[in-house]
């Protein structure tokens, strides 16, 4: 592995132009910033100890007749294409903070490549990242990969794919000649993975060692690739971050997706007739549809015939090594949103959740019939007398906690699986001052592991202890990409053998994830 002590020397060499591509960099042209891909030559930038190539098309723009159509190949280009700026984000509402910008441009199917600037005697592992954002927001370029690539000695590829209605809308009117609607964003991801297989070597990567990893919606997408027959051979390992895909709300059946699409179309058809959908501007479609169906991979058709739960139970999935896990306090982010909503509704900037809010939150999440049992399992008094913390624990455990345990045990029956829990506390808060901190400790909530792996402007800088944990996590993630193994015992059919990842002495340690997240209770609750 490229050690951190070498970075200064690499940076000097890059600045002086002393480094040249090695013979293993198949697409090199003599200038390390210029690479020949299968569609043409791109020129990137030397940035410290890494090379970056941004906005490289991996598919044709999904415009005109290509809107709501399977991904088409990118066209070839002549000359040298500038790859020093990110491509456009795919059309999105920009309402899922802080993960995505608002965008109305469909010419967005691009990848970004970050590679160590130093030569290597052998190809490097490739890590392909699928961003989160509820399948409606986000972009690849927001995840700066310089630390991950340089410290881990890997090639990192981040991907843009179609989102929201343009990526996942299912509707009978969109189905022609036996084609299934929905899953256009998923098809984009497959095309990006094929691009990686064809072009990784040009950037010094090993096309025979590709790790697919994602967070939240990106992880549920990666999970879908695990079970999609046509994703066979496109990756060699998988990392699932906060995306346990055996959750009840992680999958949508084809029948339900079609019902949702018809229902949403009916609501907006007065101003956007279905005959005009292919010629309407992205903004006309993204924003009316943006608050409609739950978007994401659609199961039950030819592309995804089985849900992850069905596939894991029967072993009918791609049996590659898996690293999977969650943040300890996943749904405190959701509770934070509830507190913000109360402050806005009451006009009181200091409003906090009370006992009534706690019970209403349990009723909404679990139904009135089960809320009493959940309240007894998660009494407010056991959570520092904080209704918010008690509600956050119940929501986190009943959702991600239960599913992460179920996911790990199911996967381990068929393939080598490792389980982790990100548990650092405190964690960096959002950098945007408009996101005021909650009245309760945010802890290790949803997305808060990301600044430990990526260079993210959306969060405040890591302190010294957090940087040490970041270095350890980058080692774990990239060593897994290199070898398919983590530095602890794998999960078995009967034991998760999970690792807690936190800063400070003893922060990385074994954790009984099932006990910590009340798994026996949730399993008995049904």
Please provide the spans of the model-predicted regions.
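Secretory targeting and sorting signals
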Residues: 1-28
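Serine-hydrolase-like catalytic core of hydrolytic proteins
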Residues: 35, 55, 90-275, 279, ...
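Extracytoplasmic/secreted proteins, especially bacterial periplasmic and envelope-associated proteins
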Residues: 48, 188-191, 195, 221, ...
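Short, solvent-exposed turn/loop segments enriched in Gly/Ser/Thr/Pro and often Arg
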Residues: 162, 213-217, 421-428, 489-496
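Alpha/beta-hydrolase-fold serine-hydrolase catalytic core, especially in secreted/extracellular enzymes
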Residues: 302-304, 381-382, 398, 412-417, ...
């Amino acid at each position: 592995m490229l050690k951190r002590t070498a970075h200064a020397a690499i940076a000097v060499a890059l600045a002086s132009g002393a480094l040249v591509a090695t013979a293993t960099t198949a697409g090199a042209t003599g200038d390390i910033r210029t690479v020949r891909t299968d569609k043409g030559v791109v020129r990137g930038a030397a940035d410290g100890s890494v090379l970056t190539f941004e906005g490289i098309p991996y598919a044709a723009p999904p415009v005109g007749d290509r809107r709501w159509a399977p991904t088409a190949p990118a066209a070839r280009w002549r000359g040298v294409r500038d790859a020093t700026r990110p491509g456009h984000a795919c059309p999105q509402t920009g309402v899922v903070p802080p993960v995505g910008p608002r965008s109305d441009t469909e010419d967005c199917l691009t990848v970004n490549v970050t590679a160590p600037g130093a030569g290597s005697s052998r190809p490097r592992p490739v890590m392909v990242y699928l961003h989160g954002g509820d399948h409606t927001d986000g972009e690849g370029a927001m995840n700066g990969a310089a630390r991950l690539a340089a410290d881990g000695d890997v090639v990192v590829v981040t991907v843009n794919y179609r989102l929201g209605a343009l990526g996942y809308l299912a509707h009978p009117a969109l189905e022609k000649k036996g084609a299934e609607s929905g899953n256009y964003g998923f098809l984009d991801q497959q095309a990006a993975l094929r691009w990686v297989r064809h072009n990784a070597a040009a950037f010094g990567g090993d096309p025979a060692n590709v790790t697919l990893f994602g967070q939240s919606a990106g992880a549920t997408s990666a999970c879908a690739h695990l079970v999609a027959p046509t994703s066979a051979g496109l990756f060699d390992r998988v990392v699932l971050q906060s995306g346990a895909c055996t959750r009840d709300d992680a999958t949508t059946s084809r029948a339900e997706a079609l019902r949702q699409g018809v229902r949403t179309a009916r609501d907006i058809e007065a101003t956007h007739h279905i005959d005009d959908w292919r010629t309407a501007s992205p903004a006309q479609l993204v924003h009316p549809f943006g608050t409609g169906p739950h978007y994401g991979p659609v199961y039950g058709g030819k592309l995804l015939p089985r849900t992850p739960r069905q596939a894991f139970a029967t072993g009918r999935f791609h049996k590659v090594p898996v690293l999977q896990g969650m943040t300890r306090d996943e749904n405190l982010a959701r509770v934070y949103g509830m507190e913000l909503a109360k402050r806005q509704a009451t006009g009181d900037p200091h409003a906090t959740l009370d006992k009534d809010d706690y019970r209403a939150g349990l009723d909404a999440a679990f139904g009135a019939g089960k809320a009493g049992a959940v309240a007894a399992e998660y009494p407010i008094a056991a959570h520092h007398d904080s209704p918010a913390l008690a509600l956050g624990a119940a929501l986190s455990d009943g959702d991600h906690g239960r599913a992460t345990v179920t996911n790990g045990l199911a996967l381990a029956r068929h393939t080598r699986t490792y389980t982790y829990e990100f548990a650092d506390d405190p964690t960096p808060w959002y950098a945007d001052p408009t996101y005021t901190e909650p009245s309760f400790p945010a802890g290790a909530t949803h997305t808060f592991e990301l600044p430990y792996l990526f260079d993210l402007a959306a969060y405040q800088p890591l302190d010294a202890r957090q940087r040490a944990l970041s270095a350890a996590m980058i080692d774990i993630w990239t060593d897994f990409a290199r070898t398919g193994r983590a530095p602890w015992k794998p999960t078995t059919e009967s034991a998760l053998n999970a690792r807690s990842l936190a800063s400070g002495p003893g922060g990385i340690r074994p954790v009984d994830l099932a006990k910590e997240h009340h798994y026996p209770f949730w399993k008995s609750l049904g």
